[in-house]
Amino acid sequence: QEGLNAALLYNDSQSGILQQISNLVPLNEVQTITLLSPYFDECGESLITLSQLCPNSTVNVLIHQDCALPPSGMLPNSSIHFYDFSETKRGKIAFKTYERQLHAKVLHFKTNDAEYCMVGSANATLAGLGTITHRGINEEFGVLYHSTKQDFLSTLGLKTKKRIDVPTNRSKHSNEAPSETGRRLRLLSAYYESGKLNVYSNEEIPDGVLLSID
């Protein structure tokens, strides 16, 4: 598309996604950051880092009210605001067959005359985005789009509407040891799709077994 530029971002041995973004986006000119993610650092480290890197900006975070890993330990920050993803145009799209779960990751920067929008695999966490000096520990990929004409948030249906407090229902993991009747399995992979968690193990999991992932 004319006027639309794109760059591939990924964590490599020399740099991370956030560092690569800093080389492509004029951070001091950013007026607004809009971020969509299903998972966050508990104390909001990545959100705070973005706010510090773009000192003239406001950070708008789109979050699901049932987010399993919200930044529930983050201290109040006048530059960071939270909005209900369910109240956006995209969030209101309903499917008849299953409850919709937020899995998308979008990081959008707006300056006075341009927009930059990254869509990819990285959550709003240090493990995904990394910092300016250190790459994240996860293997992540994303595409950063740049345009002086495109309104990315309108196109994606992600305009902020209803402001909310930070959700506090962060999942808690038990520190208790497994019962004597329990056994440990090595999980090869797991993914969530259409309201169903699919788990693959190194051995067959019998029917009727209660699986606890810690």
Language model region names:
Residues Q1-D214:
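PLD/PLD-like phosphodiesterase catalytic module centered on the HKD motif
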